[in-house]
Amino acid sequence: MEQKLKVGILGATGMVGQRFISLLENHPWFEVVTVAASPRSAGKTYEEAVGDRWKMDTPMPEAVKKLVVLNVNDVEHVASTVDFVFSAVDMSKDEIKAIEEAYAKTETPVVSNNSAHRWTPDVPMVVPEINADHFEVIKDQKKRLGTTRGFIAVKPNCSIQSYAPCLAAWKEFGPKELVVTTYQGISGAGKTFKDWPEMVGNIIPFIGGEEEKSEQEPLRVLGKVENGQIVKAELPKITCQCVRVPVLNGHTAAVFINFEKKPTKEQLIEKLVAFKGFPQEAELPSAPKQFIQYLEEDNRPQVTEDVNYERGMGVSIGRLREDTMFDYKFIGLSHNTVRGAAGGAVLCAEALTAKGYIAAK
């Protein structure tokens, strides 16, 4: 790419916005030129607006420190400065729906980390390794919006990243039923231990809205395109409990699974480690070389050892074994703010760029 695409971050001061800025530092295709946030941050430099709330392990990139924060509601102005935007705004669902459509209608593609449009029939919800073919509904979405280049694409919830890829890898065996419990790090709530001290040594057995997303969203990712819309898959049936645990980054899933055609353990592992998709074939900049790793040790995957596998863009699976009530059980782990949030959205944007949906204005 001769000239980098100009990128704006909507909701740039929050945790996911910060992760976008951190991941996009020195990106070969994209350059952050605009940061937008709430009216109270507007007019300040990015450094001033974030203040002591920078939550990343790496320092704030020099290139963004002096960018003046724009008001995210000033849609025309923000859109005029960029080729496309990443959305991580913190608003009500209806407000997010409206503002993302408003940006799309300025002919600015929107790649969103938010849940507001995940069930809009002509908005693709994509894990690029699994369902990059769903991008084809964008042409129908553009007709609805009356745009030529503006559209919305979203990524699914962070909680499903540690088991949904397995379902795609094992498709030929017909995953039929899943019982899942997720153990989710506190960064998923936009927090650190500094600002959520009551999570130290604690477990909270409820995360609002998360169980429904964890049960339903994999079916949309595994669905198919029909008549310009995405029709969700019928199977597998999924039941899920989601638990907040005292870990900073990383979502772990304990999964029990039944298949229509029960495979051997060796077949399952072989399919996992061989699984690849469009990002690997196209050698996208953020793509993990090996999307899924299988760990043989009994005590893996562990957050401290494995959450940053493939720079946080890969998925780690372990403890696959036969079960007395189900066919198999296993443990999965993914990085919730990299693969599960900003990193997954960056990979989506790379896939959209490689396929010609995003280009310079």
Across the structure, where does each feature detected by a protein language model lie?
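Charged docking surfaces used in two-component/phosphorelay signaling
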Residues: 187-361
